[in-house]
Amino acid sequence: MKRKSERRSAWATAPPCSRRSSSSSPGVKKSRSSTPQELHRLEQQDDLYLDITDRLCFAILYSRPKSATNEHYFSIDNELEYENFYADFGPLNLAMVYRYCCKINKKLKSITMLRKKIIHFTGTDQRKQANAAFLVGCYMVIYLGRTPEDAYRTLIFGDTAYIPFRDAAYGSCSFYITLLDCFHAVKKAMQYGFFNFNSFNLDEYEHYEKAENGDFNWIIPERFLAFCGPHSRSRLESGYHQHSPETYIPYFKNHNVTTIIRLNKRMYDAKRFTDAGFDHHDLFFPDGSTPAESIVQEFLDICENVKGAIAVHCKAGLGRTGTLIGCYLMKHYRMTAAESIAWLRICRPGSVIGPQQQFLVMKQSSLWLEGDYFRQKLRGQENGPLREAFSKHLSDADDLSLNGLENQDNQEPEPYSDDDEVSGMTQGDRLRALKSRRQPKASAIPLTCPLAVLTSALCSVAIWWIVCDYILPTLLFCLDGFRTQ
């Protein structure tokens, strides 16, 4: 193993994306079932440096770096942290992406760092490695104009690997989204105008995502808002915050929300929204399940004929809500199922759970064709060449179940009644309770506030002492001199 000074010298002269302390592989992943001997071997792995630009570098380090005159190291591992429900660990939300990008831009523009290499480093925790790489990749896509593939290739140089992201369900996971899925989602969201960091309202996002402040997020600004289900009255019950319809009405009216779609059992009277001037629709299906085809088509039909924004909720506003909004994203923006899930989770962590993920994968091709036909129809080409393929695909899809097996009864499921959702704790209840119990974490900015106040107070005292002990007596002496003349 080379010494730190030798490693820095070697890094400074090495070609881009290959700056390692030696030829061994630093990107080997730790398994959760690793033996102590394997862990000891992995701890001896060498550091990895990946050049992003001539001044920006991403590093995976197996020991904390020391400062240098020509390098500035920083880490966000303990600053921008994902708030998990169960075993989920990412991706980080849109506010954290914004904070990270602002941090990078500030460092690159800092006068005191103009001659320094900016090195974002992460440690040995695989989950934090994945989230750190996610942030770096997002910066490359958003600010450096890289394609998702280019950003991903930069990060997986050599044998470097990152664990994929999983859902917020309790227990095992059978579906994952990758960094590349996330980068594609961010790229398409940029292209379609889903976010713009030049006008992004960080305070609003971080305020309203909290359970106590309404627990809602925009998925598509001015079009789709996902929120947790309102109750008959506002209170703290069973460990989570409950909000009445009246809690949301002022914000909805100020942001042109015209339609409410409820996917869960009736916890409030819809008249409280309709009397306030909103349209309200009920499309019930069981918590944690996937919607029937009739539910999907009715949801899409409502959304395609609504003027203004649409607020969608189930119990927690995560599973059922994310699933149907995901269907809309696939039909009208031709996002893949994985990209739709990735974008939903970047906007609203925890969205789309369990079998709902495979459901979206199954629906992808048919919804793409529906979207193609929809756009063709709008252009006055109702009898165009896509019609035949579209009709054939729908007839084929009707013969398949979620698992790809033949549908034996060929019958549409009965419409779901809210009586089917029992009064006991369901998945949505548990997720809401977990979110409500989260303790607010101090970010890097609030942590500096006490220091700023203390510094300001000390400066004030020092100035007052200088004025009173030196300047003021001098002025009084001069004034006395003028009086004696």
Swiss-Prot record:
Concerning InterPro entries, the annotation shows: CDC14_C, DSPn, Prot-tyrosine_phosphatase-like, PTP, Tyr_Pase_AS, Tyr_Pase_cat, Tyr_Pase_dom, TYR_PHOSPHATASE_DUAL_dom
Region span, Disordered: 1-38, 402-424
Q: Per UniProt, what is one GO molecular function of this protein?
A: protein tyrosine phosphatase activity
Motif Nucleolar localization signal per record, residues: 1-54
Superkingdom field: Eukaryota
Q: Which Gene3D superfamilies does the annotation name? A: Protein tyrosine phosphatase superfamily
Region span, Linker = 199-212
Asked if the record carries the keyword DNA repair, the reply is yes
EC no.?
A: 3.1.3.16, 3.1.3.48
Gene Ontology cellular-component terms listed: nucleolus; nucleoplasm
> Which keywords does this chain's UniProt record carry?
DNA damage, DNA repair, Hydrolase, Nucleus, Protein phosphatase
Q: Where is the composition biased (Low complexity)?
A: 15-28
Q: Where is the composition biased (Acidic residues)?
A: 409-422
Catalytic residues (UniProt): 314 (phosphocysteine intermediate)
What the entry lists under PANTHER family is as follows: TYROSINE SPECIFIC PROTEIN PHOSPHATASE AND DUAL SPECIFICITY PROTEIN PHOSPHATASE
Subunit comment for this entry? Interacts with FZR1/CDH1.
Role according to the record:
Dual-specificity phosphatase involved in DNA damage response. Essential regulator of the G2 DNA damage checkpoint: following DNA damage, translocates to the nucleus and dephosphorylates FZR1/CDH1, a key activator of the anaphase promoting complex/cyclosome (APC/C). Dephosphorylates SIRT2 around early anaphase. Dephosphorylation of FZR1/CDH1 activates the APC/C, leading to the ubiquitination of PLK1, preventing entry into mitosis. Preferentially dephosphorylates proteins modified by proline-directed kinases.
Q: What is this protein called?
A: Dual specificity protein phosphatase CDC14B
Q: Which organism is it from?
A: Mus musculus
